[in-house]
């Protein structure tokens, strides 16, 4: 198969769909790989690194799309990229369609087969291609939150871990999944006062066993969330409904009760965000303030630590890329129902039911 890797063009997105090591694996399996010039420069891979392992460097994204059957990316295709997709193309990348109807309609119009990293499943029901970026975003959320709590950034002027004689900051983490647990690990490492909220009692028990006395856990009812945001200096939104839009857990009314200079970090912004006042921001302009509360809602948080993120993502995606290249999309999905769960769009139709429901579009099973 002919596989293409275009340079990412989303704002401040430095990751790359395939590292030279991943390209080497594809070439060794008999596939051709076309890489847009400078695609790897964001993580310090020059074109020569790709050429050494057998890739062909092409000057533009248009050349990548023209020469390739499968397009491997990191973030959702931008309008100029969607315009280059054809029915013959297989697109493998993060899509997050539930919060992006224009993208969904563009992909439907293209006729391409689009498999989303974030809805590929594993035998255990986990999301193996979302996990590495959730780990990164969870850990980053505490770094970011601590930064914006500084007075110079407009924050409350609070040190997460406090000092002897001064209480630490209270951190409320909404969601005890992969992002939430990684946020908790970072926050407890800084000696913050951490509580994780979730609606799954079994998960809360697991978290209690994992962290012991270093955190508190609580069931995520409306009342407990309202009290949590009122008391917390830092709130992390880390909820996920696979494929669907994130639930709005923190309302505008709750926001008005929060301390001035406190910080919200919405990891779920890719899926529409879990705060009523959330709107997607960029690394160029990452925060805004409503009712005295700082909102950080950057939709590609891991892009800020591109090298770590790119390697972590490639470790997870490579086996699936190889399977798709070796067998073709139809045969690969027929053989692997967990990969088939990643199919979001094909033949001009929405193939993922939660996505269709979120966008109020027709769901047509593959």
PLM regions and their residue ranges:
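Residue-level detector of alpha-helix initiation sites
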Residues: 76, 136, 177-178
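Adenosine-phosphate binding glycine-rich loop
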Residues: 118-159, 269, 274-366
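An N-terminal-biased, well-structured beta-alpha scaffold segment characteristic
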Residues: 2-106, 110
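Generic hydrophobic/aromatic pocket-lining and core-packing "Φ" positions
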Residues: 23, 47, 82, 104, ...
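Rossmann-like adenosine-cofactor binding region
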Residues: 209-291
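Glycine/serine-rich phosphate-binding loop and adjoining beta1-alpha1 elements at the start
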Residues: 2, 8, 79-169, 298-300
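Glycine-rich phosphate/diphosphate-binding loop of Rossmann-like nucleotide-binding domains
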Residues: 6-45, 152-240, 287
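Short glycine-/small-residue-rich Rossmann-like dinucleotide-binding loops
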Residues: 69, 75-76, 95-96, 221, ...
């Amino acid at each position: 198969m002919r596989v293409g890797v275009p340079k990412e063009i989303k704002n401040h997105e430095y990751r790359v769909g395939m590292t030279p090591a991943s390209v080497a694996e594809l070439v060794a399996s008999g596939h051709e790989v076309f890489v847009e010039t400078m695609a790897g420069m964001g993580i310090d891979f020059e074109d020569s690194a790709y050429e050494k392992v057998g890739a062909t460097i092409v000057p533009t994204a248009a050349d990548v799309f023209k020469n390739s059957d499968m397009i491997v990316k990191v973030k959702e295709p931008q309008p100029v990229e969607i315009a280059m997709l054809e029915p013959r193309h297989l697109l493998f990348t993060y899509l997050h369609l539930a919060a992006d109807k224009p993208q969904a309609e563009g992909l439907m119009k293209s006729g391409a087969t689009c498999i989303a990293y974030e809805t590929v499943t594993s035998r255990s029901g986990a999301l193996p291609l979302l996990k590495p970026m959730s780990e990164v975003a969870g850990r980053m959320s505490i770094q970011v939150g601590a930064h914006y709590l500084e007075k110079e950034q407009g924050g409350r002027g609070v040190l997460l871990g406090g000092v002897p004689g001064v209480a630490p900051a209270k951190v409320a983490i909404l969601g005890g999944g992969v992002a939430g647990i990684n946020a908790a690990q970072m926050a407890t490492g800084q000696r913050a006062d951490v509580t994780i909220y979730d609606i799954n009692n079994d998960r809360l028990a697991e978290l209690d066993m994992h962290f012991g006395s270093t955190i508190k856990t609580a069931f995520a009812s409306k009342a407990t969330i309202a009290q949590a945001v009122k008391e917390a200096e830092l709130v992390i939104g880390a909820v996920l409904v696979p494929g669907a839009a994130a639930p709005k857990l923190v309302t505008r009314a709750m926001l008005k009760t929060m301390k001035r200079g406190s910080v919200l970090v919405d990891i779920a912004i890719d899926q529409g965000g879990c705060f009523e006042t959330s709107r997607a921001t960029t690394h160029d302009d990452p925060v805004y303030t409503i009712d005295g509360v700082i909102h950080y809602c950057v939709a590609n948080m891991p892009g800020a630590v591109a090298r770590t993120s790119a390697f972590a993502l490639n470790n997870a995606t490579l086996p699936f890329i190889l399977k798709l290249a070796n067998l073709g999309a139809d045969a690969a999905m027929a053989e692997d129902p967990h990969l088939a769960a990643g199919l979001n769009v094909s033949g001009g139709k929405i193939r993922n039911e939660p996505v269709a429901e979120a966008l109020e579009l027709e769901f047509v099973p593959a």
